[in-house]
Curated annotation (Swiss-Prot):
Its EC number is 3.6.1.31. It catalyses: 1-(5-phospho-beta-D-ribosyl)-ATP + H2O = 1-(5-phospho-beta-D-ribosyl)-5'-AMP + diphosphate + H(+). Keywords: Amino-acid biosynthesis, ATP-binding, Cytoplasm, Histidine biosynthesis, Hydrolase, Nucleotide-binding. Its main location: cytoplasm. InterPro entries: HisE (IPR008179), PRib-ATP_PPHydrolase-like (IPR021130). Coiled coil: none annotated. GO terms for cellular component: cytoplasm. Pathway: Amino-acid biosynthesis; L-histidine biosynthesis; L-histidine from 5-phospho-alpha-D-ribose 1-diphosphate: step 2/9. One of its GO terms (biological process) is L-histidine biosynthetic process. This is Phosphoribosyl-ATP pyrophosphatase. One of its GO terms (molecular function) is phosphoribosyl-ATP diphosphatase activity.
Amino acid sequence: MNRNNVIDSLFNIIEDRKDKPIEGSYTGYLFEKGLDKILKKVGEESSEVIIAAKNEDEEELIKEICDLTYHIMVLMVEKQIKLDDIEKELEKRRERICNKKNERKTIEKL
């Protein structure tokens, strides 16, 4: 299975678990508990990625990035954001990757 197929397949499974919960499913559990639980897991996994990177443990870092990616996908489904939405935004940003720092647009303050 190629890279996009793995990501698409996982995303489709997550969407399916939201629409048709399966008893005992961890993904279903996250959706049942709601946004606060999902956000808590995204935060936890983000911290674990940082720690694994700091500890220079490549195998652990890969695992933690996978965990974070999964939980980000759960968040995306919860907030009705599609993979295509992310791909379109990344495509827009890709055009600016080679820009020099002083040529970049300033980021609006939140």
